[in-house]
Amino acid sequence: MTEPGGPLSAAETVHLVRQALEGGEPMASVTVIEWRASGESSQVARAGAHLAVWSDRSRGTLGDARLDERAVELARAALSGPGRVASHEIETEAGVCVVYVEPHRPPPELVIVGAGHIARPLCAAGALLGFRVTVLDDRPEFATRERFPEAAEVRRADFADPFRGVPIGPQTYLVLVTRGHKYDFEALMDVLRRPVRPAYVGMVGSRRRTRAALEQLAREGVDPERIAAVRAPIGLDVRAETPGEIAIAIAAELVLERRGGTGRPLRDTERVYERWVRRAGE
């Protein structure tokens, strides 16, 4: 659906982006950066024209209905996947329009269940990585703003119903690091019984405890696909020992899940020495 109205100014577009992000709604902005006319054709789109696009509607115009239609398709494609800022050429009978498509998404949510020694450095790392961090714990002396100054929210929660009042959606990353395996498991069961699938669910624990938890989930009839997706034991294998090291291993896995990649050292994937330096010396 295209909402009525004429061209958008840059200020109006910025306002719509800010409004969407504050409301937790993804959107994309499309901006004309160049118009190349075909022969004697008149200029259809002018550099600086803006279009605002959501999943179900759009506002503004680039100057031509067919041009708008194609721009909306590009914007929604960027929103539906991990699309990043990109320029595209849209060909029309009158010429070629070069547009800049920029997806705008609310920051992903990182919910840390447990406010202990791993949670503190993980909260700091999560905020640094651009997550909106919420920390939950049932102990009032642990669930404090002083312990987690980087968190957007610090909540005292009942581990019998840990996510009450906490929205969980497809852009939520959940890390279960409570003071006891029993609480981790109960929170995990709560999450996996929900119809919505979070972007990431990870649980701390030894190999033995992880196996026991996953076997229990299978006995409870939880979808095997959901069980297999649980990151447990949590984090990348960097032989982490200290709370800070464990937090960094978890944070690295969050980035891997969010951005994609192999998790291997870049030295091994790029092989700069073998491909160029050593070859040049032979």
Regions found by a protein language model. Give the residues of each.
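Segments forming oxygen-rich coordination pockets for charged ligands
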Residues: 1-138, 142, 146-155, 169-173, ...
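Adenosine-phosphate binding glycine-rich loop
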Residues: 204-282
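ADP-ribose/adenylate-binding Rossmann-like module
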Residues: 136, 173, 178-181, 189-216
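Short amphipathic alpha-helix with an adjacent loop that forms part of the alpha/beta core around
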Residues: 160-170
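Conserved SAM/SAH-binding loop
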Residues: 157-162, 182
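Short, well-ordered alpha-helical microsegments
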Residues: 119-120, 184-185, 210
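Short amphipathic alpha-helical segments
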Residues: 123-125, 147-148, 167-168, 186-190, ...
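Short beta-strand segments
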Residues: 31-33, 113, 137, 177-178, ...
